[in-house]
């Protein structure tokens, strides 16, 4: 078998860091929207 060079994903370190930065920003944005949505629903109809 041929040896693999570099990372498993095939990305360079800089590309991987850039991808990670955008992935984290997207995750934080999604989580913020979910928290706001849950808060608004809880204000409308408290479940506790």
Swiss-Prot record:
Q: How does it sit in the membrane?
A: Single-pass type II membrane protein
What's any one GO cellular component for it? plasma membrane light-harvesting complex
Q: Which coarse location class describes where this protein primarily resides?
A: membrane
**What residue ranges lie in the Cytoplasmic compartment?**
2-21
Keywords of the record: Antenna complex, Bacteriochlorophyll, Cell inner membrane, Cell membrane, Chlorophyll, Chromophore, Light-harvesting polypeptide, Magnesium, Membrane, Metal-binding, Transmembrane, Transmembrane helix
Topological region Periplasmic: 45-48
Query: Is Membrane found in the keyword set?
Result: yes
Tell me where on the tree of life, at the top rank, the source sits: Bacteria
State if Cytoplasm is listed as a keyword.
no
InterPro entries from the UniProt entry = Antenna_a/b (IPR000066), Antenna_beta_CS (IPR023623), Antenna_beta_dom_sf (IPR023624), LHB-1/5 (IPR002362), Light-harvesting_complex (IPR035889)
Q: Where are the transmembrane segments?
A: 22-44
What is one GO biological process annotated to this record? photosynthesis, light reaction
What is the role of this chain? Antenna complexes are light-harvesting systems, which transfer the excitation energy to the reaction centers.
Family of the protein in this entry: Belongs to the antenna complex beta subunit family.
Complex formation? An alpha/beta heterodimer. The core complex is formed by different alpha and beta chains, binding bacteriochlorophyll molecules, and arranged most probably in tetrameric structures disposed around the reaction center. The non-pigmented gamma chains may constitute additional components.
- Which protein is depicted? Light-harvesting protein B-870 beta chain
What species does this protein belong to?
A: Rubrivivax gelatinosus (strain NBRC 100245 / IL144)
Gene of origin? pufB
